């Protein structure tokens, strides 16, 4: 059996070094790139899965509708007879340092709203509450933090990741 996953890695080159969008998983306290499972209808079009997960895991703050990307995939064994196929999408975004700061501020505002709803026992979007921090940082900064081993092994230590970041052979996407 195969399960399908997507990893969304927005990267911006505005500034001296590329900065990557990272989030911290609320449960495990690992810093990761946005990662999630694909719904059945998304399996044929995993970029939709990556974009949905990106929006959910950034609390609705980052919602990309069109742009450029490059991608690669890898497969890991979850258990005997179960493979996880990961589609990794590098999304090229043009966020200035000021915009990056503003997006992180909005993420934190949304987190406060969610926490207030929890206290008041009001309904809230559970899918928006998977990560407790969001950041734009260089890979050097990202590598100083507690990271999920699967991201390190299959993305950060994968030459395809660096080929995708530097590739000028980009694809375009546009969704409604």
Can you name each region flagged by the protein language model?
Residues 17-63:
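Conserved Nudix-box catalytic region and its N-terminal flanking loop in Nudix hydrolases
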Residues 1-21, 87:
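Conserved N-terminal beta-strand and adjoining loop/helix that marks the start
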Residues 22, 88-90, 136:
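Conserved hydrophobic/aromatic beta-strand scaffold that supports enzyme active sites
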Residues 13-15, 24-28, 81-83, 95:
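Short, flexible beta-strand-to-coil junctions
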Residues 61-74, 84-86:
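A short coil-to-beta-strand element that immediately follows conserved catalytic motifs
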Residues 4-6, 29, 34, 85, ...:
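Residues that flank catalytic or metal-binding motifs in active/ligand-binding sites
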Residues 91-97:
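Phosphate/ribose-recognition catalytic cores of enzymes acting on nucleotide-derived substrates
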Residues 27-31, 98-176:
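Nudix hydrolase/Nudix homology domain
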């Amino acid at each position: 059996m195969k399960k399908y996953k997507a990893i969304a890695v927005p990267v911006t080159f505005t500034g001296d070094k590329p900065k990557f969008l990272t989030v911290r998983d609320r449960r495990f306290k690992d810093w990761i790139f946005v990662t999630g499972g694909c719904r059945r209808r998304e399996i044929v079009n995993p970029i939709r899965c990556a974009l949905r997960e990106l929006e959910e895991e950034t609390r609705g703050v980052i919602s990309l509708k069109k742009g450029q990307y490059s991608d690669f995939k890898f497969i890991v064994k979850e258990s005997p007879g179960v493979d996880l196929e990961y589609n990794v999408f590098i999304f090229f975004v043009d966020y200035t340092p000021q915009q990056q700061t503003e997006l992180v501020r909005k993420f934190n505002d949304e987190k406060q709203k969610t926490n207030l709803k929890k206290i008041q026992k009001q309904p809230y979007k559970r899918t928006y509450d998977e990560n407790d921090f969001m950041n734009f940082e260089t890979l050097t900064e990202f590598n100083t933090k507690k990271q999920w081993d699967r991201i390190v092994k299959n993305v950060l230590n994968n030459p395809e990741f660096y080929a995708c970041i530097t590739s000028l052979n980009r694809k375009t996407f546009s969704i409604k």
